Amino acid sequence: MSTVSGLKRPQSSEKNHRDRVFVRATRGKVQKVVREQYLRNDIPCQSRACPLCRSKLPKDSRGNVLEPILSEKPMFLEKFGHHYLIPDSNIFYHCIDALEHPNNFFDVIILQTVFSEISSKSIPLYNRMKRLCQEKTKRFTPFSNEFFVDTFVERLDDESANDRNDRAIRNAASWFASHLASLGIKIVLLTDDRENARLAAEQGIQVSTLKDYVQYLPDSEILLDMVSAIADAIASKEQVESGTKNVYELHWSMSRLLACIKNGEVHKGLINISTYNYLEGSVVVPGYNKPVLVSGRENLNRAVQGDIVCIQILPQDQWKTEAEEIADDDEDVVVSTAAEPDSARINDLELITKRNAHPTAKVVGILKRNWRPYVGHVDNATIAQSKGGSQQTVLLTPMDRRVPKIRFRTRQAPRLVGRRIVVAIDLWDASSRYPEGHFVRDLGEMETKEAETEALLLEYDVQHRPFPKAVLDCLPEEGHNWKVPADKTHPLWKNRKDFRDKLICSIDPPGCQDIDDALHACVLPNGNYEVGVHIADVTHFVKPNTSMDSEAASRGTTVYLVDKRIDMLPMLLGTDLCSLRPYVERFAFSCIWEMDENANIIKVHFTKSVIASKEAFSYADAQARIDDQKMQDPLTQGMRVLLKLSKILKQKRMDEGALNLASPEVRIQTDNETSDPMDVEIKQLLETNSLVEEFMLLANISVAQKIYDAFPQTAVLRRHAAPPLTNFDSLQDILRVCKGMHLKCDTSKSLAKSLDECVDPKEPYFNTLLRILTTRCMLSAEYFCSGTFAPPDFRHYGLASPIYTHFTSPIRRYADVLAHRQLAAAIDYETINPSLSDKSRLIEICNGINYRHRMAQMAGRASIEYYVGQALKGGVAEEDAYVIKVFKNGFVVFIARFGLEGIVYTKSLSSVLEPNVEYVEDEYKLNIEIRDQPKPQTVQIQMFQQVRVRVTTVRDEHSGKQKVQITLVY
């Protein structure tokens, strides 16, 4: 497509309106496309020192003039004077970690050109830039140079898009410098592009590389660690080009990869690295019954967990099974930046090809990197103690065992020993055994609660910054004094039902403050029951297309850790105005059923409402009240009706094939004052837990059907696909060999039935253990937009429901907020917002909240694991455990008491002579001969076996951190 540029000259202005004319030729036809671009002259510079732009400042929704962002007297540096910064796109792309430093880089102008370039390369980086603009103390401001008459530039005929953008950045910097010159404020253009810097200097623009600039800042030593990797990367590339020996095969070119994907020579997919063996990954490929195995350092070829890779299937005689050994820590440490000789490398695990081998492949290219900031600690063995404060190369050992060690350069090496730090990967050349990165920040001393919690939040990408002012400005002005209007003629009462006289209560975990749901039940004159589920009316406060709505969508969910909660919504809403607390009036969204004695639904209707909860119970308190026959008040009788009906509803679900799976859930008892862990206990589930669950499920199903009927293409639903039968192959074989049992997995109903039948009278816990392992064969449930799947694929496999959504927790889940908006439109309470009719936008939102949901779950589990370790610190516990995986050099056990999994290495069974180990693969068994006893003995370990283990925490001398150690008691 060729481009013709023209200038349209309206009578009012010659400069403010441009046409861009594109001439497109398709199949011999010429089509002219005209795109108009209007240029403005009223965009302010955002400097508080500038009197000329005062009249151009925008106003907020209340008509108040918004104050300029940039300070009146910006930072003074001897070389640059008082100045504002304009970084180019590459500075943000490569060095945003440095720009985010809390004590440096203030008064920064982000040009629209830069925003556009970054958004096309990396949406996560683009979002980080937007968040910087929301941080009041940093004073980062966007500037629409592409729409400003004095800074817009046309692309020249012989000019590349990149060169045009560089020129636009220089032009904007030149305008700012001229505009602010009389105020004594200078502009510094930050760029590491030599040609861009040369051209800027020729235009008289003050220019600096980032590395030169940070040398003048107070925290220069830390900042230099954060930016030096870019210069090192350039040097590394020059070294590769000069003939440095490669450790890995070169990746194929992008054009070759795309062509080979098209012709089927290679396959693309997301790579998952094994949690037991960092040298083994797998990729799900359409057409293969099992995930394709990628085994060994060379075959992984620099792929990192979560990368989108291209793989080439190896010849069948090179196919392998999954690793039979647990890969221990990488013991050989090499920090040289040159390619290492073969003798310095760790030998990859040797795997034997067997009759049931997996399709095996090698990585030939990477389509999309999943690099992120990684939390870990400096490997002490890589620190040269004699170097003092000079820069040296060290290795980061990431917390995530699936991630390789990361090489980075730092001047702070001795000070970083024993610290939790964050490092980002910059590149991984074929000549380097390890990826290269740069230091981002120090989180604090390892094993301190603050540092480990911060590390956990970063590792699982939990957004935990304070809510920005733009979000807080969306809250009601009355704050905690907000009340439901007393006058029912008030507009806020319009189309709301008054349910304040209903005997409504909530039942939640102890100490719950963000109460999403409440219930009631009563007998109707015709003998049927009225049952109501009342959900916090969050969407009354959180409106579409507001800063609060964007923030909630970005966070996706509230994250629950042992000692804290990371809220999706500001606390004023989550724990007060939206929370269905007792004894106060609250707005709600109610789902009301009429049911008969057998819990058959006669009719259902939905309405916005006003409720006044009569009581807030914990599960235990509600159970005690129901069980106390002295309590015959109407509220308690209503709770008994709810319990009776919930049991019928549950049985109906089970009869339809709903799965009763198991997952380990523990509760950490903490000190009330310090939040230090004191003990670990298994969560006790009561009938009231099931009571609440059944009615929440019923409400979600009822709402799902309603919004799908109203919006068949854009309803936000939740599906749980049936797992492929091959997911059960390994578990089926283990069951057959070790127990002589079999699971029927063709439907959820047959699976539920066979799970009930798999009972070992000698081992009461076996059935629970089997349900835990069956859960791991399942696919994850996911949010989706109804127009993207056929109705049969809406089904929720685990719940045995043909349709499902999430409606009942809008305080803590953004998916529920969307369902509330769609339901409100479906009952004609309000018109549908255009954003909820945009299928492509909803698909994007669903993908985002699916990701946030997964991360929140993993963060919660990691928090429990950390606190279990802290509760055990300094002590020794002997507990029953169950073998759930067997390798050549160890076995994995599950300790039900702590909900903890851990590895028992066979070498730990002897203190002097290493045991002789016979691995009986076909029987999932280890015969371990322990030789340093007065009389040698043989210990036998097999899948599902109950064993006694000793659990302690020990300080790892190599890493300097505490870790749980599990040994066999025999």
Swiss-Prot record:
Keyword Manganese included in the entry's annotation: no
Tree of life domain: Eukaryota
Domain RNB: 496-827
Chief place where the protein resides: cytoplasm
Nuclease found in the keyword field: yes
Domain CSD2 positions: 394-461
Stretches for region Not essential for function: 1-74
GO molecular function, one term: 3'-5'-RNA exonuclease activity
Record keywords, A-Z: Cytoplasm, Endonuclease, Exonuclease, Exosome, Hydrolase, Nuclease, Nucleus, RNA-binding, rRNA processing
Location of the protein in the cell: Cytoplasm; Nucleus
GO annotation, biological process: exonucleolytic trimming to generate mature 3'-end of 5.8S rRNA from tricistronic rRNA transcript (SSU-rRNA, 5.8S rRNA, LSU-rRNA); exonucleolytic trimming to generate mature 5'-end of 5.8S rRNA from tricistronic rRNA transcript (SSU-rRNA, 5.8S rRNA, LSU-rRNA); nonfunctional rRNA decay; nuclear mRNA surveillance of meiosis-specific transcripts; nuclear mRNA surveillance of mRNA 3'-end processing; nuclear polyadenylation-dependent mRNA catabolic process; nuclear polyadenylation-dependent rRNA catabolic process; nuclear RNA surveillance
EC number: 3.1.13.-, 3.1.26.-
Domain PINc: 83-198
Residues of the S1 motif domain: 869-969
Domain CSD1: 251-334
Parts forming coiled coils: none
Top enzyme category: hydrolase
A single GO cellular-component term on record: nucleus
Subunit relationships: Component of the RNA exosome complex. Specifically part of the catalytically inactive RNA exosome core complex (Exo-9) which may associate with the catalytic subunits rrp6 and dis3 in cytoplasmic- and nuclear-specific RNA exosome complex forms. Exo-9 is formed by a hexameric base ring of RNase PH domain-containing subunits and a cap ring consisting of csl4, rrp4 and rrp40; dis3 associates with the base ring of Exo-9. Oligomer of dis3, pim1 and spi1. Interacts with ned1.
Family: Belongs to the RNR ribonuclease family.
Biological role: Catalytic component of the RNA exosome complex which has 3'->5' exoribonuclease activity and participates in a multitude of cellular RNA processing and degradation events. In the nucleus, the RNA exosome complex is involved in proper maturation of stable RNA species such as rRNA, snRNA and snoRNA, in the elimination of RNA processing by-products and non-coding 'pervasive' transcripts, such as antisense RNA species and cryptic unstable transcripts (CUTs), and of mRNAs with processing defects, thereby limiting or excluding their export to the cytoplasm.
Name of the protein in its database record: Exosome complex exonuclease dis3
Organism: Schizosaccharomyces pombe (strain 972 / ATCC 24843)
Lineage of producing organism: Eukaryota, Fungi, Dikarya, Ascomycota, Taphrinomycotina
